[in-house]
Amino acid sequence: MSSNSAVQSKSPLLPKENPPVKAFPDNIQVSSSLLSFLIYILYTFSISGLSTFVITKYYIRPQWLYTLALRRALIKLYYNFMDGFNKRTDTLQHRVDDKKILKTIEKWSCIKEKLRRVANITEQEQQCIPAESSLDLSIQAMKGVVNAELYQFGSQISGSLEFDTPIGNLQKQIVSLKSKMINI
């Protein structure tokens, strides 16, 4: 019995061929685990890329993709066209403004010429009138000359000017001066 009890108290011996497996090895190689992780990531992305390709190829209708691309191309074409159109209208507007400025300069030179002529005529009138004549006569003569010149100038440019331009404002002043001189 004692030999029997001694046998029962002893645990059976494990075979030497199959030692117990450790869950985590003692020496882990970082490069191999990193390489396996990268391979796993690449595999996952390749599957998702293939699935995206399959979904867009067979499940999403290609007409939707084509219409979206066509819409984007048309919007881009429209914006390019409108941008070019705006640039062309801006250059044309500058040309029109330049022409208006040139016309204004020509009219100002015409006005200066008329004023020089009025000044020359008044000088001639002052020289012709004797020193004994009254101041009333010289004012009346100058008023007649200025009225004639202003009437001639106003009739030349009356139809071609707008009142919001500098020449138009000058024309308004001339008309008001004319009415004041007539009332004197």
UniProtKB/Swiss-Prot annotation:
Keywords: Membrane, Transmembrane, Transmembrane helix. It comes from Schizosaccharomyces pombe (strain 972 / ATCC 24843). One of its GO terms (cellular component) is Golgi apparatus. It is found in: Membrane. The chain crosses the membrane at residues 35-55. It is a single-pass membrane protein. This is Uncharacterized protein C23H4.13c.
